Amino acid sequence: MAEFIFKDLVRSRGLEDHFYIESAAVSTEEIGNSIYPPAKRCLNAHGIPFDKSKTARQITRADYDRFDLIICMDRMNLRWLKYIIPDDPQDKVHLMMSYAGIDRDVADPWYTGDFETTYNDINTACESLLHKLIS
């Protein structure tokens, strides 16, 4: 959801030529799967466009060099990421909610089924992140 929420925020400000935004998983369990149907419904409910052909891929060590930021939704993903990208000398790796000044993980709808709370967390953090990047 975060990829498409952030893309929508960037697009709404006419900044899409200045950003390349892509999501990737730290684990292999969802590789090749499309966006989870309840996440699609939540994005649709908020009018957020998404790529219907998007499938999950795993982050790679090369992604560290390709991207300016690598943002994890929660501390567990951050721990798993360290197996793939053990060092962060350029301070690129951050927790999503830290951009909103909140010291907690994004609410995980996998366990709660509450995609609306997750949407709100991600949207709040993405708004703050975009503000920081364009300031």
Model-derived regions, located:
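A short linear-motif detector with a strong N-terminal bias
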Residues: 1-2, 49-51, 72-76, 86
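Conserved active-site segments centered on acidic
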Residues: 1-66, 131-135
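Phosphate-binding/catalytic loops
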Residues: 63, 69, 75-135
